[in-house]
């Protein structure tokens, strides 16, 4: 009986927290069903009435009048291309850093890690000018800019995992005649799957939710 009472209290607390977290999301959904003028005049947290109800007309207008599908496509392309580029380049970079123990690899590692503490706002104007000069100001090349900003976290995560990967497996593959690229793609990549998934989720959430960088750089 005492155990049941102890389990009820955390359940109640978590339920209240869940309701508080879900409530704004539900209100966003309800406000999307109101007429535009009612969103500000009737209050954000008020349920739509018969006078303010607009149904799915707002969604139809966003698709037909505001190029929502085009914007969604660009967001999808930028996110997928950026994440794929980050995963490929940073996993290879981390492999080099761990396996080639030299001054260059150490400098490269600390340079990537240091990039995590550099906010975009600090280099925003310079980067915008550079992106215009190098033609990195469109949805298909901005992924190179995202690679630069996302490399720090990705290299840091991949480096830690590669250090725990046994070198003997790679040496055995090299003895069997595998080239370095074959060792990387056929041996290391399958071992790195957990880290690849974790890094992909983090980078995808960051790129997808980012607004300031593409707003500053992209010219369509």
Residue ranges and their predicted role:
Residues 2-218:
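A structural signal for multi-pass alpha-helical bundles of membrane permease subunits
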